[in-house]
């Protein structure tokens, strides 16, 4: 039987020699090229590598240098300076299994079509060192650079590329659906397409982001805690564009969000030093959803277009489609503002249930009246005001056609609707306004005051008067708020300067000094050119007996006198406004 022993010995020796020879050949440049060509020609993978290294001192370790692997379908690609494969006994019974896979200085691209069959490989540990990972999902890209870390074990299953295991990774940068993160560190567990992160920290726009939570298999982010600190974020987008862009973000559900010292800036808007907490709030397709959401937010400075607000404090409750504004305070210039109310998203209705404006200084924007003739911006249909108090306000309009200014303005709105079905107007309520002094196109008025009552389809003044020098002006205004909003206006002047109307753009009257006169007009408030719709009459008489009776047609005063009833001589003007300025 000695011959059998010798045969076995020589057979084993030949096998070892063959293995060693094969290993030596494979490690040559010629052998490496042959293996690359063999795989590329007979599988769905395109493979190239510069060298295969193996050492008898580390028999379980195989090193692949300058390796490139990609699928013909394009759903996976890997390029790396070096890939180390560590074998164990399981590798011989399960092809494709490795005790450890290390990818160094690599670049990995994965599409949403990739699955466990894309690269039938698994490992006890998958480790990445300074690797770039890029995943495409339709038109959206997740891009991570400088990734270092690992997942154990790594066993892709079905459409899942990660399997079940624990992970810990760091990355120099991560672009997640346009959100630029840097210096990322995270750890947690992964189960299929769902993973949890026990800790996630990152730098966001020079600030700090810290979070704990999970991502569901459906792609929804569930955040237990999210902390944002010292973030400085800029965008070229307007608020409208920014809101539209959120529709493409993945769904987010947050139990608790805390923000401190945040600065945000975009096109014609800026938020400085935002702090606050938000609880139990979800965003799905750019829309918030909650049944018991709460928000406490403070902002040191807020700029919207050219309007600047400061020291804003708000307390909100969110239920279904409704936001209850339990508290909203702030400053506008030197004024103090306080409001409560609610917003209903389903009906697009804003109710301001109480409000106070003290020492308000407000300059009307250009074309403000034209804006009121147009429909309101999309997204809001109704605005109702209740219990609104204004004290010691200053209102200014500097447009050159008809500038005006009102000082020491005081007003009260018991209830009124100012927006209905997207149209501006006054419905269903009453208001009163008074001012210490006013100037309308260089005509000074003293103690003007107005009370107005509005119904379902019309509005009218019940009191409307002011002193002008030694004279008195009484006015009446009534409008129907449907269609072109036809209106009627009457001005009765008693002992007033006869040239007031010429200061207001009308043809000079043939009257001198103080006079009694009446101006009656009918027109359409929603016309593009209101003056061209004006029709009416001007009649009056001064102290010298000079009279005027002129018709007004399409905004032009006739030079030809018309028949009118004699204007009665009025008694000397009496001040009907008390010195204390109270409205009677």
Predicted regions mapped to residue ranges:
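Terminal hydrophobic membrane-targeting helix
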Residues: 19-114, 179-181, 195, 207, ...
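Fold-core signature of tandem repeat domains
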Residues: 147, 174, 195-204, 209, ...
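A structural feature that tracks compact, well-ordered secondary-structure segments
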Residues: 186, 198-201, 212-214, 314, ...
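N-terminal Sec-pathway targeting helices
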Residues: 1-17
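Membrane-proximal interfacial segments on either side of biological membranes
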Residues: 3, 92, 97, 106-168, ...
């Amino acid at each position: 039987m000695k011959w059998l022993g010798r045969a076995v010995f020589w057979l084993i020796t030949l096998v070892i020699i063959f293995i060693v020879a094969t290993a030596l050949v494979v490690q040559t440049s010629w052998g490496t090229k042959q293996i690359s060509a063999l795989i590329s020609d007979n599988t769905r993978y395109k493979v190239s590598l510069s060298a295969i290294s193996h050492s008898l001192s580390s028999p379980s370790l195989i090193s692949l240098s300058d390796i490139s692997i990609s699928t013909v379908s394009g759903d996976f690609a890997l390029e790396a300076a070096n890939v180390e494969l560590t074998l164990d006994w399981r590798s011989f019974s399960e092809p494709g299994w490795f005790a450890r896979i290390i990818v160094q200085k690599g670049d990995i691209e994965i599409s949403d079509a990739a699955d466990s069959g894309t690269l039938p490989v698994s490992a006890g540990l998958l480790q990445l060192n300074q690797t770039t990972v890029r995943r495409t999902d339709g038109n959206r890209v997740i891009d991570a650079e400088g990734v270092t870390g690992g997942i154990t074990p790594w066993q892709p299953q079905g459409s899942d590329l990660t399997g079940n295991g624990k992970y810990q990774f760091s990355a120099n940068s991560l672009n997640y659906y346009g959100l630029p993160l840097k210096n990322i560190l995270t750890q947690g567990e992964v189960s299929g397409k769902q993973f949890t992160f026990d800790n996630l920290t990152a730098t966001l726009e020079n600030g700090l982001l810290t979070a704990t939570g999970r991502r569901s298999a459906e792609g929804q982010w569930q955040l237990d805690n999210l902390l944002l600190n010292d973030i400085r974020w800029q965008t070229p987008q307007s608020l409208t564009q920014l809101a539209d862009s959120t529709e493409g973000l993945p769904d987010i559900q947050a139990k608790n969000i805390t923000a401190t010292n945040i600065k945000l800036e975009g096109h014609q808007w800026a938020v400085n030093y935002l702090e606050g907490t938000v609880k139990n709030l979800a965003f799905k397709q750019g829309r918030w959803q909650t049944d018991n959401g709460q928000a406490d937010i403070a902002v040191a400075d807020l700029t919207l277009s050219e309007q600047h607000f400061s020291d804003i404090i708000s307390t909100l409750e969110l239920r279904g489609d409704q936001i209850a504004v339990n508290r909203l305070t702030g400053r506008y210039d030197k004024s103090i503002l306080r409001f409560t109310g609610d917003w209903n998203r389903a009906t697009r209705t804003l109710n301001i249930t109480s409000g106070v404006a003290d020492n308000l200084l407000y300059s009307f924007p250009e074309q403000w009246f034209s804006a009121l003739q147009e429909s309101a911006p999309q997204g809001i249909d109704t605005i109702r005001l209740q219990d609104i108090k204004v004290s010691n306000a200053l209102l200014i309009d500097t447009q050159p056609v008809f500038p005006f200014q009102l000082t020491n303005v005081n007003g009260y709105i018991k209830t009124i609707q100012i927006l209905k079905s997207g149209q501006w107007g006054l419905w269903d309520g009453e208001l009163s306004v008074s001012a210490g002094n006013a100037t309308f196109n260089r005509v000074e008025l003293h103690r003007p005051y107005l009370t107005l009552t509005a119904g379902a389809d019309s509005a009218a003044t019940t009191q409307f008067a002011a002193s002008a020098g030694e004279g008195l002006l009484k006015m009446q205004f009534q409008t129907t708020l449907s269609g072109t909003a036809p209106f009627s206006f009457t001005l009765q002047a008693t002992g007033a300067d006869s040239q007031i109307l010429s200061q207001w753009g009308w043809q000079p009257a043939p009257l001198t000094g103080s006079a009694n006169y009446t101006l009656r007009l009918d027109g359409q408030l929603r016309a593009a050119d209101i003056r061209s719709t004006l029709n009416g009459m001007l009649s009056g008489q001064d102290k010298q007996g000079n009279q005027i009776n002129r018709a007004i047609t399409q905004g032009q005063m006739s030079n030809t006198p018309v028949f009118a009833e004699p204007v009665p001589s009025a008694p000397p003007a009496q001040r009907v406004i008390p010195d204390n300025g109270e409205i009677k």
